[in-house]
A protein has these predicted regions:
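Polytopic alpha-helical membrane-helix bundles and their juxtamembrane interface segments
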Residues: 1-144
């Protein structure tokens, strides 16, 4: 999203990918018993917090702040909230399933399905909306 309208540092993608892999792999290893579920949870939280730090205070946040495209800034802000709030649902589900004494499988399915709706469908709709807004602005300036 930012790459399309501003110059970003090359390592940003890799840092976000590493944070994501740390989060997902740690919690997967904890869930499958290859490491302590508590350690998997904590390391996963560290990976997620690293992603959030990159989005708020790292190169991604700085690139967005210097971007002059309102549509991209709106989409970045909304998606950053989704990553902050929406991704926490996965941690809540992991905690409920593995650390809080277990949870009803139907409740977990509802939790994870709501997280997927928020984190995948709405995420994509925000990007689509920003692209439409940007296209409309570009078309209106070309007509003048």
């Amino acid at each position: 999203m930012l790459k399309s309208v501003t110059d970003i540092k090359r390592g940003m993608f890799w840092r976000l990918l590493v944070g994501t892999l740390v989060w997902v792999i740690a919690q997967l290893l904890g869930a499958y018993g290859y490491m302590s579920v508590t350690l998997g949870f904590l390391v996963g939280i560290v990976g997620w917090l690293y992603i959030i730090g990159e989005l708020y205070m790292g190169d991604a946040g700085r690139s967005n702040a210097s971007c002059n495209n309102e549509s991209v800034q709106m989409a970045f802000f909304a998606n950053r909230l989704i990553i902050t709030i929406g991704f926490s649902i996965y941690h809540i589900g992991y905690f409920n399933e593995h650390l809080a004494g277990g949870a009803n499988i139907n409740s977990l399915n509802i939790i994870y399905n709501l997280a997927d709706i928020l984190n995948k469908i709405i995420f994509g709709m925000i990007i689509y909306s920003a692209a439409l807004q940007d296209t409309k602005k570009r078309d209106s300036t070309n007509e003048v």
